[in-house]
Amino acid sequence: VYLTMTDWNNAEIYAKKVMNKYPLTSNNNYLAGFSDINTPSWIWGMEQSEEQNMGDYSPYAMWYIGTEDGGYGYWSFKCFFLAQSFVDKFEANDVRASQFRWEWDMVHYTLKFRDNEAGRGSIVFMRTESMLLNAAEALCRQGKNDEAKTMLWQLQDMRGATRSVSTGKELLEEIWLERRKELYGEGYGLF
């Protein structure tokens, strides 16, 4: 809320408080697919029970969910694909890029979201990475470029992305790009 209110100081303070309580998503957890409510970095999520979800299975069915071996996932309606321009934002050694799959020689899908064995993957609403990126943006907007970069580097280093060397407006743009790359499909924006 403080970020939206442009209260940069409080946005920084409270994002850091939350970050102190939850770890970042390990690469192993990231690559396992987002379906487990018990993932340590999930601050807020919703488990899909049989009573809540009687037949449509998880909302991840709206994504084209393939399997690692090229098969089709549970109840995939094949509605959401990744644009080539978005996929191109990821460097080859970025662990997040390893989840992209090319289908029909024309579209990308992702293994980021997967159903669990019961076909009802939990839904993530907020992760520690969101707080990290909020803190980095708040720091940048306060002119604390070195602190903002140090915050951003935690995520970039973990994922295998190149560290940002920018300052000012360019650093802010890189923080926003990293937000898009890290949090895509998690409800922060679909376009």
Regions found by a protein language model. Name each.
Residues 1-72, 84-191:
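Acidic/polar-rich alpha-helix caps and helix-coil junctions
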